[in-house]
């Protein structure tokens, strides 16, 4: 049975072929969208549709026997319900004047709309947590870089200040030494002048002796 035959089979119950076609399209569209989003669609007495992730693996090419790597992928999967299995196996007989699939319990169709499965929710939360951790790490790296730059600037400034102070001290020491040398140089000629004056006293002494000698001769 294909889609057109399915529509023909339910057209009488839905009031016409167009209404049946619209109903089939609406059911299939809702089913496909839910499975693609990661939801599990369960129909009581019929089965469930769900999305299954297959990890990367190796397979054999049936024609050449060559080993081929198969990438990670997701596939839809249908699991038949127990009621459906019992009808197919023959353990239960199909009802003649009733619906083959067990009807949904009263009140089950008026509940809240289906939500995303827990697995999908966990994946989304994990992605958000990873993004937040990356942002935090980036901020920490920026802070460390800024701290390193600030420390380098302070160290360089301190080194420059120390160098300036040391240079100033050396300059002051040189100035003091030069002043001391100049003072010593100025004081030295005074000593020489004193030394020069000393012979004058000797000359006076000689003159006095000469005068005394002349007096004696007389």
UniProtKB/Swiss-Prot annotation:
Subcellular location: Cytoplasm, Nucleoid
Bacterial histone-like domain, as annotated region: 1-91
Cellular component GO terms held in the UniProt record: cytosol; nucleoid
InterPro entries, A to Z: Hist_DNA-bd, Histone-like_DNA-bd_CS, IHF-like_DNA-bd_dom_sf
Annotated stretches, region: Disordered: 101-218
SMART domains: BHL
GO annotation terms (biological process): chromosome condensation
Low complexity bias: start-end ranges: 127-161, 173-182
Source domain of life: Bacteria
Record keyword Membrane present: no
The entry's keywords: Cytoplasm, DNA condensation, DNA-binding
Intrachain disulfide bonds: none
Record bears the keyword Cytoplasm: yes
Region listing for Degenerate repeats region, in residue ranges: 118-218
GO molecular function: DNA binding; structural constituent of chromatin
UniProt biased composition (Basic residues): 162-172, 183-218
Subunit structure: Homodimer.
Summary of the function given for this chain in its UniProt record: Histone-like DNA-binding protein which is capable of wrapping DNA to stabilize it, and thus to prevent its denaturation under extreme environmental conditions.
Protein family (similarity comment): Belongs to the bacterial histone-like protein family. Long actinobacterial subfamily.
Protein name: DNA-binding protein HU 2
Species per Swiss-Prot/TrEMBL record: Streptomyces coelicolor (strain ATCC BAA-471 / A3(2) / M145)
